[in-house]
């Protein structure tokens, strides 16, 4: 396992709406505007949406030669419709161009797609930083002991499913899972986790488990949230999102609390 932690200037840009979480993260040096690296970046980002959809939702490539070589990986979550995948990638690349005007490394991981580029090859590297939690600060409004038990079990189950190596699936469909659990009679927890497919199963599991722990340190008890890292991502909420739950059967609501009748003398 190769673990890299980057202590570099980081520029984070966040956008949160009711059903969308987007984070553009830019770091690790600068390039000259209108120089060769800039032209390479614009060239590959401009056509990325069509290439991802044409390659079954996953695409990786390089462009140029050192010192202006660029490495890129992009994907949509399994099952995303081509039009939605293309729109997500296009919005992501536009956001990177705006938010990272001359940074040599950047990534963005909205709900149903991700884009990551660098001037250094990162395939298979366990790069954990920069990372960022995003959450709704409103309190969950239920008993935290009950919530923690259900949420922890759901996250553990989802991570186990995602981190298994799915040899029968295409490369871009590895390391992904979405699942649900009943919280109350009227509330359901929705979770989605994903890693990029270039890392090992063990590294994927490590990243997701570490991300869950870090998320709980900052955001325990909040209504919904996400935690983004360069090669793994978690999100949960109390409503379905990203089209990830269309084929998942909702669980039965928990049984009502039973009341023990009084004992008569």
UniProtKB/Swiss-Prot annotation:
Keywords: Glycoprotein, Receptor, Repeat, Secreted, Signal
Residue ranges constituting the Gnk2-homologous domain according to the UniProt record: 24-122, 128-241
Gene3D superfamilies to which the protein is assigned, alphabetical: Gnk2 domain, C-X8-C-X2-C motif
GO cellular component terms, A-Z: extracellular region
Endpoints of the signal sequence: 1-23
Matching CDD domains: Gnk2-like
Residues the record marks as carrying a glycan: 34, 102, 119, 247
Subcellular location, record wording: Secreted
Family recorded in the similarity comment: Belongs to the protein kinase superfamily. Ser/Thr protein kinase family. CRK subfamily.
Protein name: Putative cysteine-rich receptor-like protein kinase At4g11521
Source organism (scientific name): Arabidopsis thaliana
Source lineage: Eukaryota, Viridiplantae, Streptophyta, Embryophyta, Tracheophyta
């Amino acid at each position: 396992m190769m673990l890299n932690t980057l202590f570099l200037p980081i520029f984070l840009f966040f956008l949160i709406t009711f059903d969308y979480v987007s984070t553009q993260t830019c770091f690790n040096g600068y390039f000259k505007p209108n120089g060769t690296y800039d032209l390479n970046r614009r060239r590959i980002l401009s056509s990325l949406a069509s290439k991802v959809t044409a390659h079954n939702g996953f695409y990786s490539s390089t462009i140029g030669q050192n010192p202006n070589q660029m490495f890129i990986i992009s994907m949509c979550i399994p099952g995303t419709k081509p039009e939605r995948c293309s729109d997500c990638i296009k919005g992501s690349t536009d956001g990177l161009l705006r938010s990272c005007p001359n940074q040599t490394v950047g990534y963005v991981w909205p709900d149903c797609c991700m884009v990551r580029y660098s001037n250094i090859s990162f395939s298979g590297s366990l790069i954990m930083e920069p990372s960022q939690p995003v959450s709704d600060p409103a309190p969950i409004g239920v008993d935290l002991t009950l919530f923690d038990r259900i949420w922890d079990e759901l996250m553990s189950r989802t991570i186990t499913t995602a981190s298994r190596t799915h040899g029968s699936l295409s490369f871009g469909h590895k390391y992904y899972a979405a699942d649900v659990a009943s919280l109350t009679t009227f509330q359901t927890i929705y979770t989605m986790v994903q890693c990029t497919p270039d890392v090992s199963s063990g590294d994927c599991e490590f990243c997701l488990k570490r991300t869950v722990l870090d998320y709980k340190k900052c955001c325990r008890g909040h209504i919904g949230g996400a935690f983004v890292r360069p090669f793994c991502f978690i999100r949960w909420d109390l409503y379905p999102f990203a089209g990830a739950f269309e084929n998942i059967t909702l669980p039965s609501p928990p049984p009502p609390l039973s009341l023990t009748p009084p004992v008569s003398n």
